[in-house]
Amino acid sequence: MLDEADRILDMGFSRTLSALLGHLPKSRQTLLFSATQTQSVSDLARLSLQNPVFISTDAAASTVEGSTHLELPANLEQHYALCALESKTNVLWSFIKSHLQNKTLIFLSSAKQVRFVFEAFRRLHPGTPLLHLHGQQKQHTRLDVVTRFGRMQHAVLFATDLAARGLDFPSIDWVVQADAPEDAATYVHRVGRTARYAKGGHALLLLLPSEEQGMLEALKARGIEIPSIKIRASKTLSIGDQLQRLAFQDPELKYLAQRALVSYVRSVYLHHDKSIFKVEGLPVEAFAASLGLAGAPKIRFLSRAQTKDRKNAPRAPTALQSEDEGDVQSSGTEDEVADSDERDSGDEDVDTSQDEPPPVAVEKQGKDAKVSALSFS
């Protein structure tokens, strides 16, 4: 059995895969399963199958080789909602509080975000079991989380895309994508955790306003169209002040918040599709406040990238330059540039040495606010 073979191809290991298949007996039966009919899957079929027969659970599925359309379960109810970056934490908390009797899977873009949201929400006691799953956990921990979540009737699992493929959780009611997927195929794999077999399911995609057009176009190009809903701000619970108190009292949680922020910005920066993921203009300070931080940490890899862009930028006409070199003031960013590489290896990109500004006041909402907040209007 070879799992995630299409991803192996995507990562450039086609020659290695061909060599492995070359050692198999020539007389054999090969079954190729995929949730998505993508070009990589078609390439894999050509590589490993002879005279293949295409079988789909959807009678209307396209049998055209290289079809770009992706199939979704007919019993999946899906929506997207626009959500400012600084509002995501409040929206997630409000959603959980209004769906306590559901089984929910929430996707975030990085392990550090998963860990922070799990630890922060756990301290706030939402009234339903919380679990988290990501690739930085040890194998026995991941297996334990998968087993426990599978057995629970009502629970929330925060996860990276580790949970998007190859896992079959029984009876998930909701899949919430707090961060946009990298592409349409990832979207399909995420929402495919619900509405499995004959059961129904719901999917909600939260998009920044800057992500809306690019993401919807990318999905539409693969045959996926999602209706929009509006989040009622008046019905959304605010937990910013509570997170700020927790971060002040618990240095570990504050540190997790800083790492989560940097990790999110890095994930946006490293995404290839810049029509969707735009690091410029991200409200970093407002996002920091929403995580309970009094100020955003310095993001060193971003400073390095900005410095590199300035160095590579064309020089202004000489007429606009000062004749005296001493009149040109340095921005000082070069002094902040570190020599470490750009890998997401931990904490080298988080600079917490700056003095903390005074606490930021966050408006409190009424206690009986509910997430009909995410009212489907």
Where are these regions (language model features)?
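Conserved helicase RecA-like core
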Residues: 1-303
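Eukaryote-biased recognition of C-terminal alpha-helical segments
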Residues: 302-311
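Acidic, serine/threonine-rich intrinsically disordered low-complexity regions
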Residues: 317-377
